[in-house]
């Protein structure tokens, strides 16, 4: 007797009075199938002895599958799809609020992983169970949406993006802190728009913030994109950054400032088409435009790093080459070096008996500083060794002891 290798599906809905043609009706039914590691179970034998093993089946782990009667073909067991979690408005607004409140910290930290963990913790306190990575990815997506809305809708993105205004406010606040007026070169570009653009940046490689490419940069501590740090820098992802969250127009990430920057010629996705270098001083990193004159570049650097004295400074590249400040300087990463000045010790004497009263250490950075010091003391020069008068700063010897001469 020949028995088919394939077991036919049993129609539990079929009446005894129905004609056999009803078997062609397409229905779906749910049946329980034993979950077992033995793939060689004889399905036909199982069919004949099903009623003997009914109680055993109930005690075993089971899984439900959906079978159709429309054909005699074997049916696949398909795992149910997991619905992607969506962010409700309250969650998104809370994320933006927390990110905005910590924006200043993103500008000074090389790794933002701990900052996203704090944001995640605050989200949980408000009843939103979102991990640091989920928060990072959502933030990057918001930045990407903002950039798309801004540049494709000519700045009128608020109509198509729910949180356009909130993101724009964060970027505007950042630009006010670090962007000097000289950056606005084009008369056709609104000041606010120019400032915001200078901090927007996308990265094709992905931000580990996820993006920025919008990747997971911030969440895992690696550079990702940054509206954060350069609109949070990864070349192209949005990262908002003052030092900056951020990946800049040349693709430099503030968190990983040694990353090779772009050449400035890539016009795809780059909100700022000028020449930009990345300058690092201590724990701070700034992206500086070098399209102006040498004097303008110096003033921008002084303003960006808060240099309020007249001490000299220079930029040194990764090959320890000191570069001239001009619009033709090579694009790349630079270290900001400050002049240590000239330190000497000055003794003050009692004019009546010529005995030393006290001494002080003075540091001069410019000839003008030296002249002002002499004028305040009422001296014409400084004297060393009791006979040599020094009238010019260049003749001073570091560490030497001097006295004033009227």
From Swiss-Prot:
Gene Ontology biological-process annotations: regulation of DNA-templated transcription
Cross-referenced Gene3D superfamilies: Homeodomain-like (1.10.10.60)
Annotated transmembrane regions: none
Impact when changing residue 278 to A: No significant change in DNA-binding activity
Effect of residue 179 to D: No significant change in DNA-binding activity
Superkingdom, taxonomy of origin: Eukaryota
PROSITE patterns for this protein: MYB_LIKE
Gene Ontology cellular-component terms listed: nucleus
Stretches with biased composition (Basic residues): 46-57
Listed result of changing residue 175 to A: No significant change in DNA-binding activity
UniProt domain Myb-like: residue ranges: 79-143
Keywords in alphabetical order: DNA-binding, Nucleus, Phosphoprotein, Transcription, Transcription regulation
Annotated effect of mutating residue 198 to D: Decreases DNA-binding activity 8-fold
PTM: Phosphorylated on Thr-133 and Ser-198. Phosphorylation is calcium-dependent and increases DNA-binding activity 10 to 20-fold.
Matching InterPro entries: Myb_DNA-bind_4, SANT/Myb
Positions of the UniProt region annotated as Disordered: 1-24, 44-63, 175-195
Residues the record lists as Phosphoserine modifications: 198
Residue numbers carrying Phosphothreonine: 133
Task of the protein: Probable transcription factor that binds specifically to the core DNA sequence 5'-GGTTAA-3'. May act as a molecular switch in response to light signals.
Quaternary structure note: Binds DNA as homodimer.
PANTHER family named in the record: FI21293P1, SI:DKEY-66I24.7
Protein name, per record: Trihelix transcription factor GT-1
Organism phylogeny: Eukaryota, Viridiplantae, Streptophyta, Embryophyta, Tracheophyta
């Amino acid at each position: 007797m020949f028995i088919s290798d394939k077991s036919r599906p049993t129609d539990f809905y079929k009446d005894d009075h129905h004609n056999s043609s009803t078997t062609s009706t397409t229905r779906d039914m749910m049946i329980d199938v034993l979950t077992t590691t033995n793939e060689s179970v004889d399905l036909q034998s199982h069919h004949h002895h099903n009623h003997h093993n009914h109680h055993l089946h109930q005690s075993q782990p089971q899984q439900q599958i959906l079978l159709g009667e429309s054909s005699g073909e074997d049916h696949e067991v398909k795992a149910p799809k997991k619905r992607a979690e969506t962010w409700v408005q309250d969650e998104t607004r809370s994320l933006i609020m927390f990110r905005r409140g910590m924006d200043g910290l993103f500008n000074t930290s090389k790794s933002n992983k701990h900052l996203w963990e704090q944001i995640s913790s605050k989200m949980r306190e408000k009843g939103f169970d979102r991990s640091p990575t989920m928060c990072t990815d959502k933030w990057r997506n918001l930045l990407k949406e903002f950039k798309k809305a801004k540049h494709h809708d000519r700045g009128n993105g608020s109509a198509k993006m729910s949180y356009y205004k909130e993101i724009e406010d964060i970027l505007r606040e950042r630009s006010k802190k670090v962007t000097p007026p000289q950056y606005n070169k084009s008369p056709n570009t609104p000041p606010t728009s120019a400032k915001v653009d200078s901090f927007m940046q996308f990265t094709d490689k992905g931000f580990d913030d996820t993006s920025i490419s919008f990747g997971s940069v911030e969440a895992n501590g690696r550079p990702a994109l940054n509206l954060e740090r350069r609109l949070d820098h990864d070349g192209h992802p949005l990262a908002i950054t003052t030092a900056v969250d951020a990946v800049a127009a040349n693709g430099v990430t503030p968190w990983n400032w040694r990353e090779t920057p772009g050449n400035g010629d890539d016009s795809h996705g780059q909100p700022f088409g000028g020449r930009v270098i990345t300058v690092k001083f201590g724990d701070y990193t700034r992206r500086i435009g070098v399209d102006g004159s040498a004097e303008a570049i110096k003033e921008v650097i002084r303003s960006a790093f808060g240099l309020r004295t007249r001490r000299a400074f220079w930029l040194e590249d990764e090959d320890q080459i000191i570069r001239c400040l001009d619009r033709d300087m090579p694009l790349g990463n630079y270290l900001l070096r400050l002049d240590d000045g000239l330190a000497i010790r000055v003794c003050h004497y009692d004019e009546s008996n010529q005995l030393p009263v006290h001494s002080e250490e003075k540091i001069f950075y410019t000839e003008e500083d030296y002249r002002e010091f002499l004028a305040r003391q009422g001296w014409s020069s400084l004297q060393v060794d009791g006979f040599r008068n020094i009238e010019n700063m260049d003749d001073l010897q570091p560490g030497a002891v001097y006295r004033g001469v009227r």
